[in-house]
Design a protein with these regions (language model features):
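Secondary-structure boundary/capping motif
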Residues: 3-11, 38, 44, 54, ...
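Alpha/beta-hydrolase fold catalytic core
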Residues: 1-28, 50-54, 72, 95
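Conserved HGGG/HGGXW glycine-rich cap/lid loop of the alpha/beta-hydrolase fold
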Residues: 18-68, 89
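Conserved phosphate-coordination/catalytic loops
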Residues: 11, 35, 80
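Flexible "cap/lid" subdomain of the alpha/beta-hydrolase fold that forms the substrate-access gate
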Residues: 14-15, 27, 63-101, 105-183
Length: 183
């Protein structure tokens, strides 16, 4: 399956994207997650094209050939930025009511667009978490059983992590996981 690498400008980015299938097919935007790229969908795109769809797989901000238009633009992975990138991509491509599919950061972007601009979306497939976050609610403590399951998130944000090499971090996480497993 051959896809073509294209680029389109939005207000903030020059978004690189791969496209396969007929221009007349139902548009399906496949959004990758962190830290992956469009290769995630290499086995999916041929199935969509065979079903008559137009598969569009962009590189998210900060990935591959997608570039910020201005050096002074803040680099952000916030859900509002990711959602706006996708909304502007839909507008720039002129696709009408695509199906949005994504996981991780890409799933979050798809959920933001579906929630804020439902008239722009034919359907939504979101997998592997990171759906829309309640920013105000995230400032409150989670229930203890949830905090127990997400312990590693606090560790990653601790001062013990700053400046450490990936090997040191991997070893520290392995030790902590082992300690939890043998309890």
């Amino acid at each position: 399956m051959t896809s073509v690498l294209n680029r389109v400008r939005t207000s903030v980015l020059e978004i690189a994207y791969e496209q396969s299938g007929s221009q007349d097919g139902v548009p399906v935007l496949l959004m990758h997650g962190f830290p992956y790229d469009p290769r995630t969908y290499d086995l999916v795109v041929p199935l969509l094209v065979a079903a008559g769809c137009r598969a569009i797989v962009p590189y998210l901000r900060g990935y591959g050939p997608t570039r910020f238009l201005a050096a002074e633009t803040p680099r952000s992975g916030q859900q509002a930025a990711l959602g706006n990138d996708l909304k502007e991509l839909i507008d720039a491509l002129g696709v009408r009511r695509p199906v949005l599919a994504g996981y991780d950061w890409g799933g979050r972007a798809a959920c933001v667009v579906a929630a804020l601009w439902p008239d722009k979306v034919r359907g939504l497939v979101s997998a592997n978490g990171y759906n829309i976050q309640d920013i105000a609610g995230s400032t409150k403590p989670a229930p203890p059983e949830l905090e127990h399951r997400l312990w590693y998130q606090y560790y990653f944000r601790s001062c013990r992590v700053d400046g450490q090499s990936p090997r040191v971090l991997q070893a520290a996480v392995a030790i902590m996981v082992t300690e939890l497993a043998v309890r």
